[in-house]
């Protein structure tokens, strides 16, 4: 079902569009969490540390593809809002070839650089063997990440957030079943967890590609070389590259912090691995709502409905902040039971450190909720450069403070650097909005 976000109730249209996206990402988090949970409970702390560190690296690599697809998706939304089908077809063709090229290049580089990662990430020797094996298999799934994100970006741009949910649901269920079978039944260690994830990724990627190509004639223009226009290639590169930079800078900062975390040893690594999964799961709905809000703004910006944009912005802030307050309270109260899901009850030190992490981060989710709205707003209004600026402020602050504070107060300094970065970026983004409001829309 395609949804025109330029008409009807603002709150209803945003929520109806956002809910399938939120459910889809919940499922995606489920098959990320499946690896962590099963590995943590059945393979021990070193395996958990290996999978956790690998997840941070893979998040960085896939963020490059995700950023390119998100930037292209914003352009698709604008063209859909304008009703310009010719430009939409040309954007689809240009973006497909460009992002496919980047994906192939990224996949080759990831294998070539695999052996150098231990030094860069400061991975302890007792963890590296499992991590190397896990990453080698996971890298095979990078093309599947491209397929899913490219075709889902088109579907969401035209207001269809339900179909991507279907394919993620199948993928998530399959991943969990295969995780249990490969790790517990066949005793395949961390390699089994990686294989389960890769198989699930290809099921969702190939499935959504076949569906979209079959049901939407516009998308079949990606094979039409006559739709590959030079000006559209430049447009896609200039627009999506900035969104890619935003996503990759954000995750590069996290990756740099991962290296610092690794220097504190397997206990802190394992606590961070579990805590990050819970953290991402907790604020993921406001991240998805920010992406849905971005599509809403982009469609209405293309249709030149500025009053609807202003009303939508006010509604989005209220919805996002209300959710953040609720989820902050829940994470703060239930931090210990949440950590116990991922870590054996006998690993007291890991649980204690994870609880400390969650309570510091969870108390300030309103900061990240506001930041996701600002990212979505500036991307939709054709100002992805501002999203990059906010990301650099947020992550730059996080990295610098993490190294400074950890040398003074220990590992807690790393945890405190995160919310400080969020709020500095929020302040910058809000000041820019106030100063440029009349120019934006």
Q: Where on the chain are the PLM-derived regions?
A:
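Transmembrane helical elements of multi-pass membrane transporters/channels
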Residues: 16-35, 137, 171, 200-204, ...
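Helix-terminus/linker motif at the lipid-water interface of multi-pass membrane proteins
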Residues: 30-49, 118-125, 181-188, 248-277, ...
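Hydrophobic transmembrane alpha-helices of multi-pass small-molecule transporters
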Residues: 60-63, 175-179, 205-209, 281-284, ...
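Short alpha-helical transmembrane segments in multi-pass integral membrane proteins
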Residues: 1-18, 76-141, 185-241, 297-364, ...
């Amino acid at each position: 079902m395609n949804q025109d976000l330029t008409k009807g109730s603002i709150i209803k249209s945003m929520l109806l569009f956002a809910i399938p996206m939120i459910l889809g990402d919940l499922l995606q988090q489920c098959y990320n969490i499946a690896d962590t949970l099963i590995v943590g409970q059945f393979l021990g702390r070193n395996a958990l540390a290996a999978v956790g560190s690998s997840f941070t690296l893979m998040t960085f690599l896939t963020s490059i593809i995700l950023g390119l697809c998100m930037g292209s998706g914003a352009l698709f939304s604008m063209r859909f809002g304008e009703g310009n089908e010719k430009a939409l077809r040309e954007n689809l063709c240009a973006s497909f070839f460009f992002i496919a090229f980047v994906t192939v290049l990224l996949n080759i580089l990831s294998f070539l650089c695999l052996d150098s990662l231990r030094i860069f990430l400061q991975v302890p020797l007792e963890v590296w063997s499992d991590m190397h094996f896990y990453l080698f298999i996971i890298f095979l799934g990078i093309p599947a990440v491209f397929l899913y994100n490219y075709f889902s970006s088109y579907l969401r741009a035209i207001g269809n957030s339900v179909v991507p949910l279907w394919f993620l649901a199948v993928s998530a269920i399959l991943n969990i079943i295969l995780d249990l079978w490969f790790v517990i039944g066949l005793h395949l260690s961390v390699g089994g967890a990686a294989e389960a994830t890769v198989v699930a990724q290809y099921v969702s990627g190939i499935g959504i590609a076949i569906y979209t190509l079959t049901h939407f004639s516009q998308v079949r223009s990606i094979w039409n070389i006559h739709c590959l226009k030079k000006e559209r290639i430049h447009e896609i590169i200039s627009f999506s590259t900035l969104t890619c930079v935003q996503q990759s800078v954000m995750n590069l900062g996290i990756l740099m912090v991962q290296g610092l975390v690794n220097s504190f040893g397997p206990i802190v690594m394992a606590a961070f691995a579990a805590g990050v999964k819970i953290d991402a799961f907790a604020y993921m709905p406001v991240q998805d709502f920010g992406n849905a809000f971005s599509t809403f703004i982009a469609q209405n910006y293309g249709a030149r409905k500025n009053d609807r944009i202003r009303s939508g912005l006010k509604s989005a802030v209220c919805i996002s902040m209300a959710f953040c307050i609720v989820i902050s309270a829940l994470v703060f109260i239930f931090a210990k039971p949440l950590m116990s899901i991922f870590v054996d009850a006998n690993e007291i030190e890991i649980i204690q450190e994870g609880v400390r992490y969650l309570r510091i981060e969870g108390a300030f989710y309103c900061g990240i909720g506001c930041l996701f709205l600002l990212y979505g707003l500036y991307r939709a209004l054709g100002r992805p450069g501002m999203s990059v600026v906010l990301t650099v402020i947020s992550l730059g602050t996080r990295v610098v403070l993490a190294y400074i504070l950890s040398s003074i107060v220990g590992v807690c300094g790393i945890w405190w650097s995160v919310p400080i970065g969020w709020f500095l970026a929020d302040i910058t983004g809000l000041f820019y909005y106030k100063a440029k409001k009349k120019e934006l829309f």
